[in-house]
Amino acid sequence: MHKILVRSNYKPLVGQIKINGSKNAILPIMAASLLSSSSVVLHNVPDLIDVHLMSELLEGLGAKVNFMHNKDHKANHTLETDCSNINNYAIQYETASKLRASFLMLGPMLSRFGKARTAFPGGCNIGKRPVDMHIKALEEMGAKIEIDGYNIIATVKGKLQGRKITLEKISVGATENIIMAATLAEGVTTINNAATEPEILDLIEFLKKIGADIKINNTKVIITGVKKLNGCIHKIISDRIEAGTYALAAIITNGKLVLEGINLSDIRCIANELEAIGAMVELYDGSIVISRKNGSIKSTNVATDPYPNFPSDMQPQLMSAMCIADGISVIEENIFENRFSHADELRKLGANISIKKNKAAINGIKSLSGANLYATDLRSTAALVLASLVASGETTINNSHHLWRGYEAMHEKLNSCGADISISP
């Protein structure tokens, strides 16, 4: 069982933190490399558990994957894939069941090879995350999809066919899967009510580089199928969720952090909320500087919604800040129905939180106290680390392996700015 030990010294975090490439961008782009018959070189790739899991899945199909490392065995953040000789069409069950993004391989596999076998995807336990919209859209495009227990067997006679598809609700994963499936389909596919997150725009940019014909107009995406896709070199966008998490670390500890490698436009929907709770967000020499304006953290009312609104992936971390804010804050979770598991753990630190359906009310208190905590998913682990930075004494976070699915070397980055965090197996 992996553990994180945080010793609070009430020290404001001060320093510089380099923001890595986006977890939510690299995974669909790695899946999209299946569409290419040539090698693909990706830069700014974060060294995360999920990236290694996706690499295993690609290699299991016959792809060559090289995640280059320096002499000290640390990743230099360049990954090369070669999917020119795929010889297996069954995605590894055990690995796929650990990784939500494994389902994004279905569209590319069907589009290029006409067949695929996979498992229902894994990932964080944050409530129902159905794949019915993915399946429905692929069936509309001509795929035959059968469910056999936990397995999904998909085939198509000939090529997938372009269709007009309207998503019943905005879905990042469904939008990505349909776009990838449509790139090698016959005819034109139009997606209405598509998600427009920066990570999707990065996927589209990558697909265009390898030869896809894609146009986007607000929430409408139009893909004209082509016969073949090639290789390219592409740099992954920076991780806005990682940036937002470290920004909150500065605010919670009343410190000052310089976030390098991220543009303000990348995190505007997050920065707006940070400014509302009393953060000062400044630009300096191409970086973003985060600190408190003055005094204490302000309470807020916020709802998570699809981009460009406040992201669900930042909700747990914001809740940690609200635990020590002035007044009562209300957070409404509109994306996932089971994303308040961190509230029980924050209460162990002394936080005053009440939950009613999809709303959490947080009555801010002056201080938190260290405790023995149990993490349940990626973002909740990050939230517990943030709260532990200002909890008196020592805090132990069990099941902390979740953190490495989305944050590269978080403890090292925070320690370089004054935190006292250690890791045990």
Swiss-Prot record:
Assigned keywords, A-Z: Cell cycle, Cell division, Cell shape, Cell wall biogenesis/degradation, Cytoplasm, Peptidoglycan synthesis, Pyruvate, Transferase
Function: Cell wall formation. Adds enolpyruvyl to UDP-N-acetylglucosamine.
Record-listed phosphoenolpyruvate binding positions: 23-24
Gene3D superfamilies: Enolpyruvate transferase domain (3.65.10.10)
GO molecular function, one term: UDP-N-acetylglucosamine 1-carboxyvinyltransferase activity
PANTHER family named in the record: UDP-N-ACETYLGLUCOSAMINE 1-CARBOXYVINYLTRANSFERASE
High-level lineage: Bacteria, Pseudomonadati, Pseudomonadota, Alphaproteobacteria, Rickettsiales
GO cellular component, one term: cytoplasm
Pfam families listed in its UniProt record: EPSP_synthase (PF00275)
Annotated compartments: Cytoplasm
Organism (species): Wolbachia sp. subsp. Brugia malayi (strain TRS)
Covalent S-S links between cysteines: none
HAMAP family xrefs: MurA (MF_00111)
Catalysed transformations (reactions): phosphoenolpyruvate + UDP-N-acetyl-alpha-D-glucosamine = UDP-N-acetyl-3-O-(1-carboxyvinyl)-alpha-D-glucosamine + phosphate
Lineage top rank: taxon: Bacteria
GO biological process, one term: cell division
Identification of the protein by name: UDP-N-acetylglucosamine 1-carboxyvinyltransferase
Enzyme Commission designation: 2.5.1.7
Active-site residues annotated for this sequence: 124
Entry's family note: Belongs to the EPSP synthase family. MurA subfamily.
Binding site for UDP-N-acetyl-alpha-D-glucosamine: 100, 313, 335
Residue numbers carrying 2-(S-cysteinyl)pyruvic acid O-phosphothioketal: 124
Pathway given in the UniProt record: Cell wall biogenesis; peptidoglycan biosynthesis
